[in-house]
UniProtKB/Swiss-Prot annotation:
The gene is MEP1. Belongs to the peptidase M36 family. Glycans are attached at residues 284, 591, 620. This is Extracellular metalloproteinase 1. Disulfide bonds: none annotated.
Amino acid sequence: MHGLLLAAGLLSLPLRVLAHPQPSTSLTSQGVDLNAYRMADRSSYMSSDEMKLEQPSISSLSGGNYVETATEVVKRMMPGVTFRMVDDHYVGESGISHVYFRQTMHGMDIDNSDFNVNIGKDGKVLSFGNSFYTNPTPDKAPVEKRDFSDPMKALHGARKALNLPINADKATIKSMNEHEVMFMGTSGALSDPQGKLCYMAKEDGTLALTWRVETDMGDNWLLSYVDAKDTDKVHNVVDYVSHATYQVYPWPVPDPTEGKRAVLQNPWNLKASPFTWISDGKNNYSTTRGNNAIAQANFDGGSDYLNNYRPNNKNLKFEYPYAPNMSPPKSYIDASVTQLFYSANMVHDLYYMLGFTEKAGNFQVNNRNQGGKGGDFVILNAQDGSGTNNANFATPPDGQPGRMRVYIWTKAKPARDSSFEAGTVIHEYTHGLSNRLCGGPANSACLNGMESGGMGEGWGDFFATAIRLKPNDNRNANYVHGEWVNNSPRGNRMFPYSTSLQTNPLVYTSCNKYNEVHAIGTVWCSILYEVLWNLIDKHGKNDGPTPVFENGVPKDGKYLAMKLVLDGMAIQPCKPTFVQARNAILDADMNLTKGANKCELWKAFAKRGLGTGAKYDPKNRTGSKAVPKECQ
């Protein structure tokens, strides 16, 4: 065998599984704190304003196609560094071109070293993000020196360190290519584990050769970076799980306490779902399956979703009884699956209109030759038996299905099914949105740092909250996340989302005392809630289920805020900080409206301590209430 025993290319890029409205930082059921293995947030981001001052030669670059321009940026900024372009570049709905690069060393990836370039509608460089490694590098390739362990030892190392219930006693190694392997004959994981030899830039500024061991455990889908020499040492871990007629609680009804069920006819948006929700363009279905999603019961928590039960009606009447006092949950499983299918498809259609399209890496089986990789609807598991009091979403790279698991919550009697809390479904689906947009559709490992992971939680809460706004709401409206499933008026966040600093005192520097992504996410959503109301106060609020555009810009403040936040996800660097994400939102507004909302945005950020003087340090963030002179 030449070189190494190794496994499956870009396909093995990790998937992000995000669990949550209920805070959980442990490897499910194994008692391992994954926070201890999070990657450091080490990206830099140069905004359009900063680039004009500090890199005018880059700012003025243009000519050729956007890929050539982006490649030239990387060459000029990182001379002598080897890299490859990731095959997921695209032109977004706002006219910004996004190109992604991965640093290489001796023909292998440095797996957490990325560079993203954003090209504006005028063909000039808008901004870029960078986490390339610049310290001393090894002289010789490890393949030449054979300076690494057998990959099987790495699998055992990951299993031991993370207490994974994987049996590999009879496992064999199948070589996929020079640097990647698949572990055959294991049990305990939902699919065959994979291994990839790659470098990892460590927090101390050195480079480690690692085996990246990928294991899908269901509620956790892990990429474990095991030291290639000392396989008892795990450097970092990425977790991908972060987590007709339809009788449903229609949007924006958030839960059974705030509205009544209704029978909706053909609720899809044909621009976003031209095959409707129950066809993929090749096959028509009479069940909860289509181009965007497939929904079913999953009582045993297993992975055989295709053969699981789902409601079926040849007349396409998905109308089933449900009331909050019904018990046990299985007695209303048809209504649960239908509600989950409805909510997830509504999210798909809305996000599509805001820019999460095929080429941006959305979740669809059939991409209609519109770009991106198809074959990846969202698997929706209702009443999932693998846990309680939670929900999660697994986000693999584009072309592999996302997976949402929603559980029964036992904090009330009778127990409550989180399919019926729209905020839970929106929050989880938004993990898929943010992980596909940040760093590009082929890289699902960009939100695994503490601050970036916190923003992943905050974005989920932000979109869930914005969608549930009521017609009579004004900036004095307060919203609690997860109150129904938790059976608590406090929900599952520290404070309500509010524009009042008395009701919600969280500011940027509050993050200094938190070491948990949901707490940090609450701070981020609190900041975005200020953005939301500043833009609504300026542009009004569209209470309809879809935005109305004028020249590509939402006409109202609610959907404009959602659009700018979504565009910012695609612009920001891999593993962003609050400061970098703030700058990306400002750049998104500069691109979309020529900066018409600059002062509204700055005032919102500054109110919560993310003004012009804010600085990131993981242990000692500096807050600022300053705004640019023109906004004073």
